[in-house]
Amino acid sequence: MLFGYNADEGTLFFPDDPQPTVWLPDTQPGDEAALTTQLSKAFPSQAEKLIALYNLDTDFTNGGMQMMGDEIFGVNIRYVARQNEEQGENSYLYYFSRVPPSKKQTLGAFHAAEIPFVFGSYETILGQSDDDKALAELMQNYWVNFAKTGNPNGDGLPGWPRHNGENWMHLTANSGEETGAETHIRKAKIDALEEGLLVKLKALDAAQTPAPSSGAVAAPN
């Protein structure tokens, strides 16, 4: 599997549903104590850490947008990759952070921003810098190699290691950032968010597990 997500996934969704977590649709801005009470319903031991990691008590909107993106995409992608690996299959994960160049750009590396790079259509949409063109060519090579062989790596390309629980390929053309394999820069955030996912999966499993039989057999009429 080759899949991933973008740095600012939440910017397209948060304005219509201003919640940092899909598990708690009524989460409201507040101080640390109020937010801890709310978030503890979904993240019993991680609420305070999440507030600090995302600065929810001081910047609910920006922190909430980032948390929403990490929760909907990042934590689930990593969980699926780990399940895939347990079955003996390889996973290649990416984190795309290139912010499309535009003076009026306020959405960051928004949901689906990487797709024009993969299909070579970026220039007709917003134009490309030389760095964008290089990133697009790199990504197209990775995707074509994976489609052909199940492995994105190839001659002359930066190595993309399979995901082993930590490795992500950071795809970017932003100033001050480099494309390459690394431990995910949001690992601490995804680690904390994972508690909410595991709580829900445990509840779902319990709901689907048949109740144990009492062993009693009804007498025939």
Which stretches of residues belong to each language-model region?
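Mobile gating loops/cap/lid regions near enzyme active sites that modulate substrate access
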Residues: 74-221
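Substrate-gating cap/lid region and adjacent catalytic-acid/histidine neighborhood
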Residues: 1-131
